Amino acid sequence: EMTSSLVGSEMCIRDSLQADGNYNWNKQQGQRNFLRLAKERGVNKFLAFLNSPPVYFTQNGLATNTGRGGTLNLKEEHYKNFARFLANVIKGVEKHDGIKFNYLCPFNEPDGHWNWIGPKQEGTPATNREIARAIRLISKEFVNNQIDTQILVNESSDYRCMFDTHMTNWERGYQIQSFFNPDSTATYLGDTPNVPRLMVGHSYWTNTPLNNLHDIRCQLKDTLDKYKVNFWQTETCIMGNDEEIGGGGGYDFTMKTALYVARIIHHDIVYAGARSWQWWRSIGGDYKDGLIREYSDPTFLNGEVKDSKLMWALGNYSRFIRPGAVRKAIIAKDNQGKIIPEGDTDVTGLMCSAYQNTDGKEVFVMINYAAEDKEFTFYQRNGIIKNWKIYRTSDKDGENLLPVGSIKNHEKVVIPARSIITLVTQ
């Protein structure tokens, strides 16, 4: 079993790897049950990540970084064992549970500048060189075991560490350049088997002030494009610096948080070019991180849950924009017909984005951040008249992706104050 000093029972995950090197596949039944339940309900892509190597391999004998700095908590002699462990887990879960992990991210927030010391560690401090060394060994182990799981780098805690440095030194910054510029010979992963030309990162800390929301993502996209690297946003929630909505403390069921998060989604997709967007987390307590608010009894065996407008607002995107969709360009014009620069984004008004799914259906998402109703006329350049069904989420009771009618191209649409609508071709 994994042992980690100071970590409470509700935070501690029991590892299947035992001290004698054998695996006990009866461990982590709760987590594995949820994987199976998800698969039964149609989920067909699974991503695994970890915050620490097994304690038998770590330098301090713990699964936290207590007493250490910003380097990998892994003994020199156990890099290969770590890679072998990951291969065994990927194969073991598929064999015993029928769950194939499509993706593995071995390092979570390796550039984290916040407190890595103590029982609440949720990250894997590591330098770029340590990451590259481990990834190459994991890749080799996967190839030898005919595992086609994709290995992702590197779950950055802050976009600024991906193209620059931010509250850390160069050894844990400039990650895009380090891993995907061939001149970075010590850390280049661009020709490593099982490693896609893809960077993953978290949009924490970069959502305020509003110029950061825009400018940091533009800088990120410029660097990604320079090295021909794709991007996924793989974790975010509300943090202390998100002062516009009161920071992370205290749950919010209303459109205030829902609209704030929708604005982040819009900027991550439109300006950072995110091809996947993921929220932390599905269920939570009195903090702005759960799509659903849980009220557990002291035994954790019973309780109640309540949905939020945040959950439904995420659905304005995820329910209709399906895997494989492509984003389409939007041109906004004023009443005189003049093109508005970046007219698809008014951070205190209307923000819109458009997509085409693999089945040919088109999707248009519009956010109205303003305190008053807005109207616009919607049309397509190709001139094909289509019917669009409208789904709306707002603070009104029952308006949770509620169908509210349909329109045709060239018709005027009114979007109520502080609401989100999704238009889908019929």
Say what each PLM segment does.
Residues A19-A48, G70-P106, I131-F142, N169-N194:
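An active-site-proximal structural segment forming one wall of the substrate-binding cleft
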Residues S4-S5, K45-L50, N102-P106, Q150-V153, ...:
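Structural recognition of the beta-strand scaffold that forms the well-ordered cores
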Residues K338-K386, R418:
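Carbohydrate-binding surface patches
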Residues V404-Q426:
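C-terminal beta-strand-rich structural cap/linker in extracellular carbohydrate-active enzymes
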Residues R381-E399:
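Solvent-exposed beta-hairpin/edge-strand motifs
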Residues E1-I13:
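Single conserved hydrophobic/aromatic residue that forms the stacking wall/gate
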Residues Q121-I264, Y271:
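Noncatalytic carbohydrate-binding groove/subsite architecture in carbohydrate-active enzymes
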Residues N230-I321, A325-P341:
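Aromatic/acidic polysaccharide-binding cleft in carbohydrate-active enzymes
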